[in-house]
């Protein structure tokens, strides 16, 4: 499972990279995101109707060399403004709720059971599920409702990699703070750290990495450089074009760039050991 210290840390991109890497290694792999908020949709035809899932999960499916499946994104929230969202469950939207009502009467009662049902179904069909978290797992005001992060990791006994964006500053504080804010029973699921979007000589980070590893008791598996690539974003405010406007060949080339960069800058053997995969 890929979680981040914040929104925009690079979770989606890392899942894209890992989907392609594990597909290249011969594994049958599927992406999954329990809950996503976006207006960037991908439409899947199912039971003679079109159902909606987040566009970024469709890109991740492409990286895994499989067809997008509505089960990859059970809960989709489409922001409508004025604290109101359309709630799309299993690709079907027929409910509009405020954030307060969503957390009070929907997320645990209806959303999470659907998440577990779809995830269990996908697990039976794949060697590996790469779960993307949402935002930060340490939003302590939402810990009891955060089905996209540690509630799901705890329920499924998932191994978590924590990714932080160093470009925006405050990376090391965000890493340590995120891990320290997690309850002890959830903290144990974090198995490693990824520093993302780095520019410069990696050696300048050596002392800081040693200190972070000592404070968190977790290894920094990789420092991923910031590179130019062109892949659709999940952010509803992002202006990148939709997946449908990318040619298959071009998108595949961009996915390979991301995967190659991750592979070259990450301790892949350590990652495989975490997952108990050869």
Locate predicted features:
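Flexible phosphate-sensing "switch/lid" loops adjacent to ATP/NTP-binding sites
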Residues: 1-278
């Amino acid at each position: 499972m890929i979680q981040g210290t914040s929104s925009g840390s690079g979770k989606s991109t890392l899942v894209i990279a890992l989907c392609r890497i594990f597909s290249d290694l011969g594994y049958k792999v599927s992406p999954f995101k329990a809950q996503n908020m976006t207006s960037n949709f991908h439409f899947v035809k199912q039971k003679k109707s079109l159902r909606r899932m987040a566009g970024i999960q469709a890109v991740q499916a492409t990286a895994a060399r499989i067809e997008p499946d509505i089960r990859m994104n059970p809960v989709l929230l489409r922001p409508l403004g004025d604290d109101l969202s359309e709630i799309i469950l299993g690709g079907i939207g027929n409910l509009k709720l405020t954030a307060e009502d969503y957390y009070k009467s929907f997320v645990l009662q209806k959303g999470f059971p659907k998440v577990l049902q779809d995830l269990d179904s996908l697990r039976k069909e794949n060697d590996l599920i790469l779960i993307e978290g949402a935002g930060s797992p340490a939003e302590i005001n939402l810990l009891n409702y955060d089905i996209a992060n540690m509630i799901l990791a705890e329920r499924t006994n998932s191994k978590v990699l924590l990714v932080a964006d160093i470009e925006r500053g405050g990376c090391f504080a965000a890493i340590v703070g995120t891990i320290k804010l997690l309850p002890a029973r959830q903290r144990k699921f974090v198995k490693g750290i990824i520093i993302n979007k780095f520019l410069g000589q990696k050696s300048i980070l050596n002392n800081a990495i040693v200190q972070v590893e000592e404070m968190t008791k977790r290894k920094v598996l990789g420092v991923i450089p910031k590179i130019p690539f062109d892949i659709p974003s999940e952010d509803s405010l992002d202006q990148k074009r939709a997946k449908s406007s990318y040619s298959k060949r071009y998108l595949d080339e961009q996915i390979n760039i991301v995967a190659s960069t991750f592979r070259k800058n990450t301790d892949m053997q350590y990652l495989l050991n975490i997952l108990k995969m050869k």
